């Protein structure tokens, strides 16, 4: 906000508290004008928001704007309706108390739009879950439905609320909107049957005709032209260009679907709306006796069809009146005038009760079935102060309501604030203001107020008229300073007050009321005959609106004025129990033109809204005050002396706290029970410090809590591990005991078997013998002889001697068998020779035993001869024995016979070699010689000079 002060000459100040000439009304007005010209429609007076209706779209209600104001301190950004909404929401969440936002101002000042913007802000910015999305949508879409049935175009406002509305938005402990509740006040039923020139009936009638499908209109017996219906054509502005009835109809139908209206509900609802239009077109004609009749019953038939009643009974109820006299019932015909009254009374009653049913139906869809405690923010959007050329009973009630709200504002701001300073002992210069309690008492005082006088006149015996009511007012309250009639006024006043009028000096100025219709509208009576017809309706909505029990109740119902007074009292009780926020709406001109600033009109509103008095109180006062207990409870974490608990008096704790924070003497005052902080910036700094401290505390609490959870989890796991370990150790111990018991039994059986091992097989040694056998067999497999020459054998136990011998023989046989199967034929022959040798020489010749391990060699003898015709034969002897001479060289004539017999003798035919050229032979071990075979002329054998033996053959062998 401070950044905007540099541009204050052009756009004014954002807070009227910053005005230098804060006591000057002209300076106030000029600041408002500067901001209005720059399209800055919002200005603060402290925490009160002043809003000027721009009559145009400004583009300041976007989602980005909502996000900008979300969670920001109140004065950090320019004034906005979102700031009021966000401040109320944050205060509600932090302090868990209920709030309400009071939006006040003249009709056409923008109250309804302000309430819609606040509702949209809550819907968009509040935390939301998918399951609560429906509740939020229903809350939002209830607004266009209520506007369609309760708003209308007036001379001053195209969308004027013709009923009072208080809406509670319910939030859970997390700040999530979970539901809502709506209370309606005094819908202007007279508008159903009559509108001033330039005004319209309720929007829903025009929306149905403009947007309803052809089939729907045909089923309701309606035409699209509103001018065809008397109840819609009296204002001569049925089709108003700024209002798009067709688009609004689509919005309303979509809202009905989201809120949860069934098709049957809509059929019955639109049937009632259509029946009201048909009622307005019912015409009456009087006969010679003055009795009314309906010449054309076309409309009657449609009404009967739509409401589900008998046409004949309905016609009789509109033209006759049933009078009960003790035990008799008398039906009297009505005049045309009374029939018109009955028709209009029926239309008003049907529409008024249907509107009440609609509000209750919406409430049932908004109700939250969770009965946990909730906080609420209330939105009060109620008709503004109205002054027309001709003001009737409705304007009287509306302006009385505004007087009560003005009184509430005075009580909660001007009067209460100054009284608080005095009671707390704070030095204060009293600000004078007009207290409108005197006007409220004039209207509502019991037995002496205008409403009480009106009720007395309605119920007194004898003919009561509007004139007699005016005379009674002159008699009872004629001396009141704020009441005037033509008879009581001076010469100047008589010119502006008619003979049937009285004038009240309201807080907003003088208003003249015409008493014509006061008694009728206050009674709001519906003939019993018509009630009976409506109670018999087959329309489910009407059956809920008109109960048969009403016919049995003979007591006179409360008048409209009394009902309205009681409902206002209940409303004020609701508002007093909540923390307030205020929005004061100002209408810039009467013509609804953008950028037009009417100084006189705005100055008048500034005066009667009490803005100057509020500014003076705010300028001289303190921006924030709180009881010591609450202040200390909230901010005690900022001071070590007060955290976590302060055990002394709260006042001393607060004093210690602000001293530690560093408050300057001019920033605050300490009262008897409260602390008063003068400047918002001081509170903001404290709140920022608290937020920082809160984050630190939260972090510490989280760490401690997580540590606690971790320790708890660790101890849990440790106990589980200990228990698991104990159980496992028990399992292992039991297994060990079982194993040892088994071992003891085994050892015992083993010892017993060992002792009895030599006895015949019996139970005492059976297991031992089996074990010994098993072990012996297992060990024997690793000590079996590898060949037939290996005579080793594992020594058997005594009990296995026989088995061991048997196994040994089997093993030996197996080895011999394997050896025999693996011997070659040559070796077999050699072994056979060994057998023959054994038979010849064993025990007879020395050296035989040493020769046993020597195999007979097949190559020990060999025979060689040449391929020539010589008779040379060489017998080769193995040179292994060094004592032997060399090979034997023979020459014989019968070489073929000798060689053959030698070969047969050694059984090796291949031992005889036939060589060519030469052959080698051993002369002695280690010394070789050579025989060379060649041919010549004659046979000869000689040794050449090289020492080689040469054998010459005269011819080749043949």
Swiss-Prot record:
ATP binds at residues 105-112. Residues 694-716, 717-746 form the IQ domain. Residues 773-955 form the TH1 domain. Residues 568-590 are annotated as: Actin-binding. Keywords: Actin-binding, ATP-binding, Motor protein, Myosin, Nucleotide-binding, Phosphoprotein, Repeat. It holds the Pfam family Myosin_head. The modification Phosphoserine is found at residue 365. Residues 12-691 form the Myosin motor domain. One of its GO terms (cellular component) is myosin complex. GO terms for molecular function: actin binding; ATP binding; cytoskeletal motor activity. Disulfide bonds: none annotated. Highly expressed in the central nervous system, including the forebrain, midbrain and lower medulla. In the lower medulla, it is broadly expressed throughout the reticular formation. It is expressed in the retrotrapezoid nucleus and the nucleus of the solitary tract, as well as motor neurons of the facial, vagal and ambiguus nuclei. Expressed in neonatal inner-ear organs. Belongs to the TRAFAC class myosin-kinesin ATPase superfamily. Myosin family. PANTHER family: MYOSIN, UNCONVENTIONAL MYOSIN-IH. Myosins are actin-based motor molecules with ATPase activity. Unconventional myosins serve in intracellular movements. Their highly divergent tails are presumed to bind to membranous compartments, which would be moved relative to actin filaments. This is Unconventional myosin-Ih. The gene is Myo1h.
């Amino acid at each position: 906000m401070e950044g905007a002060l540099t541009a204050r000459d052009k756009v004014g100040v954002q807070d009227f508290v910053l005005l230098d000439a804060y006591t000057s009304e002209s300076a106030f007005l000029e600041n408002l004008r500067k901001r209005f010209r720059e399209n800055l429609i919002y200005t603060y007076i402290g925490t009160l928001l002043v809003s000027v209706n721009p009559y145009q779209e400004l583009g300041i209600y976007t989602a980005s704007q909502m996000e900008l104001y979300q969670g920001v301190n109140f004065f950090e950004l320019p004034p906005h309706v979102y700031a009021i909404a966000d401040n109320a929401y944050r205060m509600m969440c932090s302090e868990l108390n209920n709030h309400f936002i009071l939006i006040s101002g003249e009709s056409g000042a923008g109250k309804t739009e302000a309430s819609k913007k606040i509702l949209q802000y809550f819907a968009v910015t509040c935390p939301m879950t998918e399951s609560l999305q429906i509740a939020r949508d229903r809350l939002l879409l209830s607004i266009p439905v209520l506007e369609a049935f309760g708003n209308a175009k007036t001379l001053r406002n195209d969308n004027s609320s013709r009923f009072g509305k208080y809406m509670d938005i319910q939030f859970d402990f997390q700040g999530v909107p979970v539901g809502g509740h709506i209370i309606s006040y005094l819908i202007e039923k007279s508008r159903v049957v009559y509108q001033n020139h330039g005004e319209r009936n309720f929007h829903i009638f025009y929306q149905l005709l403009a947007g309803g499908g052809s089939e729907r209109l045909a089923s309701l017996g309606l035409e699209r032209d509103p001018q065809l219906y008397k109840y819609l054509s009296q204002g001569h502005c049925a089709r108003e260009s700024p209002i798009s009835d067709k688009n609004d109809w689509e919005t309303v139908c979509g809202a009905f679907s989201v809120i949860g209206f069934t098709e049957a509900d809509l059929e019955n609802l639109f049937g009632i709306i259509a029946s009201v239009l048909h009622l307005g077109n019912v015409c009456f004609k009087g006969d010679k006796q003055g009795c009314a009749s309906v010449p054309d019953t076309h409309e009657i038939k449609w009404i009967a069809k739509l409401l589900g009643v008998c046409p004949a009974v309905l016609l009789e109820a509109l033209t006759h009146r049933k009078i009960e006299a003790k035990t008799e019932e008398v039906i009297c015909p009505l005049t045309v005038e009374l029939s018109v009254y009955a028709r209009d009374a029926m239309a008003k009653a049907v529409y008024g009760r249907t509107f009440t049913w609609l509000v209750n139906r919406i409430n049932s869809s908004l109700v939250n079935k969770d009965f946990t405690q909730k906080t609420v923010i209330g939105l009060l959007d109620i008709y503004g102060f109205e002054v027309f050329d001709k003001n009737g009973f409705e304007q009287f009630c509306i302006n009385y309501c505004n007087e009560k709200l003005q009184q509430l504002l005075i009580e909660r701001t001007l009067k209460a604030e100054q009284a608080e300073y005095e009671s707390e002992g704070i030095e204060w210069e009293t600000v004078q203001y007009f207290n409108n309690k005197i006007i409220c008492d004039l209207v509502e005082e019991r037995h002496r107020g205008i409403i009480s006088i009106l009720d007395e006149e309605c119920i007194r015996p004898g003919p009561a008229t509007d004139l007699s009511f005016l005379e009674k007012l002159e008699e009872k309250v004629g001396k009141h300073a704020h009441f005037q009639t033509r008879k009581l006024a001076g010469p100047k006043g008589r010119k502006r007050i008619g003979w049937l009028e009285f004038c009240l000096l309201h807080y907003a100025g003088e208003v003249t009321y015409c008493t014509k219709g006061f008694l009728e509208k206050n009674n709001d009576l519906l003939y019993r005959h018509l009630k009976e017809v409506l109670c018999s309706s087959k329309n489910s909505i009407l059956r809920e609106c008109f109960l048969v029990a009403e016919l049995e109740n003979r007591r006179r119902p409360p008048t409209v004025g009394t009902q309205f007074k009681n409902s206002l009292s209940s409303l004020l009780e609701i508002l007093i129990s909540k923390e307030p926020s205020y929005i004061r709406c100002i209408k810039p001109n009467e013509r609804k033109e953008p950028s037009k600033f009417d100084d006189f009109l705005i100055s008048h509103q500034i005066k009667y809204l009490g803005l100057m008095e509020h500014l003076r109180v705010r300028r001289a006062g303190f921006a924030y005050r709180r009881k010591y207990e609450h202040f200390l409870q909230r901010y005690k974490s900022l001071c070590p002396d007060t955290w976590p608990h302060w055990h002394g008096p709260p006042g001393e704790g607060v004093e210690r706290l602000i001293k530690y924070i560093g408050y300057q003497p001019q920033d605050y005052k300490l009262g008897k029970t409260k602390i008063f902080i003068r400047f918002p910036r001081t509170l903001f700094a404290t709140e920022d410090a608290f937020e920082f401290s809160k984050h630190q505390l939260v972090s510490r609490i989280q760490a401690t809590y997580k540590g606690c959870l971790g320790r708890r989890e660790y101890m849990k796991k440790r106990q589980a591990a200990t228990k698991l370990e104990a159980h496992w150790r028990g399992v292992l111990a039991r297994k060990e005991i079982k194993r040892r018991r088994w071992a003891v039994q085994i050892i015992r059986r083993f010892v017993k078997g060992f002792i009895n091992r030599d006895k015949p097989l019996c139970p005492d040694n059976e297991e031992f013998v089996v074990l010994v056998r098993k072990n012996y067999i297992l060990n024997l497999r690793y000590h079996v002889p590898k060949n037939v020459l290996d005579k080793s054998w594992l020594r058997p136990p005594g009990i296995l001697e026989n088995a061991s011998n048997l196994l040994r023989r089997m093993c030996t046989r197996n080895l011999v068998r394997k050896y025999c199967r693996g011997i070659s034929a040559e070796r077999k022959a050699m072994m056979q020779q060994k057998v023959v040798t054994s038979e010849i020489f064993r025990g007879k010749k020395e050296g035989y035993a040493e020769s046993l391990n020597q195999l007979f060699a097949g190559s020990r003898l060999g025979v060689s001869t040449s391929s020539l015709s010589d008779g040379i034969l060489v017998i080769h002897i193995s040179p292994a024995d060094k004592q032997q001479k060399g090979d034997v060289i023979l020459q014989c004539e019968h070489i073929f016979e000798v060689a053959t017999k030698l070969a047969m003798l050694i059984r090796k035919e291949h031992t005889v070699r036939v060589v060519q050229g030469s052959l080698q032979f051993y002369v002695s071990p280690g010394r070789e010689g050579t025989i060379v075979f060649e041919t010549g002329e004659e046979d000869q054998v000689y040794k050449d000079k090289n020492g080689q033996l040469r054998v010459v053959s005269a011819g080749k062998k043949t």
